[in-house]
Design a protein with these regions (language model features):
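Beta-strand-enriched cores of mature, soluble protein domains
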Residues: 1-154
Length: 154
């Protein structure tokens, strides 16, 4: 099997779905990036260098497990796609549940979720694997989502 490892930083926002089912639809984009992590006497730091190239597109639906209005402190499910261009799209769904909660008192939120890769199209047609997401949402509703993926291709 071939293994693909990736780290990406997606930026975007979620909006309520128009159908009234308490589903939020998120859409975000991530550029090509080179990450450098450095451990020093002062601690650890990461730098990101944006590279020329296409952007990946992340589209998902998010719903609280109890199907109530989406809010902090409530476990949720998220499913959707990540498109890497040229018809190469990953499908994913939640492993367990995701959660998020306030950070401080300025309206910022932090959360995390794990997704299972469920195939896709193009290169990812029979892909399996796991993607982790550590995300933040600011008071204005803008999100930043750090992904780490370990994908296996047959």
């Amino acid at each position: 099997m071939r293994r693909i490892l990736y780290n990406m930083v997606f930026r975007g926002r979620g909006e309520s779905a128009p159908d009234g089912e308490n589903i939020s639809i998120t859409k975000s984009f991530a550029p090509c990036v080179r990450f450098t992590t450095e451990i020093t006497a002062d601690g650890v730091d990461m730098r990101m260098e944006e590279l020329d190239g296409p952007k990946a597109e992340f589209v998902s639906k998010v719903q609280n497990i109890d199907r109530s209005e989406f809010a902090a402190g409530k476990p949720f499910r998220e499913w959707g796609t990540i498109s890497f261009g040229n018809g190469n799209v990953l499908n994913f769904d939640t492993v367990g549940t995701g959660e998020f909660s306030p950070v401080g008192d300025d309206g910022q939120m932090q959360g995390g979720i794990v997704w299972c890769v469920e195939g896709g199209t193009g290169l990812f047609e029979k892909a399996t694997g796991i993607i982790t997401s550590n995300f933040g949402i600011d008071a204005a509703g803008d999100g930043i989502d750090y992904h780490t993926g370990v994908i296996y291709l047959p």
